[in-house]
Amino acid sequence: MLLSVCSRFISSPSAAAVIRSSRAAASALPRTYSSISATEIAERTKRMLDAKEQSGLSYDELATKLGVTNTYTAQLLMSQAKLTSETAIKLQEALPTASKQDIEDMQTTFPMRAFDEAILKEPNVYRTYEAITHYGEAIKSIINEQCGDGIMSAIDFYCDVGTTTGKHGEKRVVITFNGKFLPHIEQKMDDNSAKSPRD
């Protein structure tokens, strides 16, 4: 999945431009916006991944200690999700070499949930992307048939990655998407709480 996004973010020319503009604007922006410094985010990500490596814990083991999915665990370390105060305590205990400042910043900084397009050149990521796009129309058709006219939320959403063993003894990857169904609405005027620009 898209688990190595942040560690690769600063490698592209477009990211370099973002970094330069971010540095120039840093003094004028509140610290709670993660866009103030892409390099700062990338450096913190490296420190957190180093702390994970030093702990000897796998993503699955760390996820169990935190009580979240393994992909969400990876997102936390890669600054793709916001750390809650409850989970912060568990994370500090699980990764004792992680700095208190990094743990604090992970709670106060709003993530930039985006990715550098260069990540799609990574074969593992691209094949996952390819699978989703290849099966996309079929998946949409089945969602429509089973749930109606709408979409699967990626906000009220859980993602978990695991493995299983095939009938020939081979290891196989299992990726589970669990998202709330969000129906499209009929835009009735009586239900619109915003003032119409035509009024």
How would you describe each model-predicted region?
Residues M1-I36:
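N-terminal mitochondrial targeting presequence
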Residues P30-Q54:
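A short, Lys/Arg-rich alpha-helix, primarily the initiator
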Residues E53-S55, M78-E86, T97:
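Short, solvent-exposed alpha-helical "recognition" segments
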Residues Y59, N70, A88:
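Helix-turn-helix DNA-binding elements, focusing on the entry/boundary residues of the two helices
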Residues E61-T64:
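Short alpha-helical "recognition helix" segments of helix-turn-helix
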Residues G67-L83:
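Recognition helix of helix-turn-helix/homeodomain-like DNA-binding domains
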Residues E86-D102:
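DNA major-groove recognition helix of helix-turn-helix/homeodomain DNA-binding modules
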Residues E104-P183:
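Helix-turn-helix/homeodomain-like alpha-helical modules used for DNA recognition
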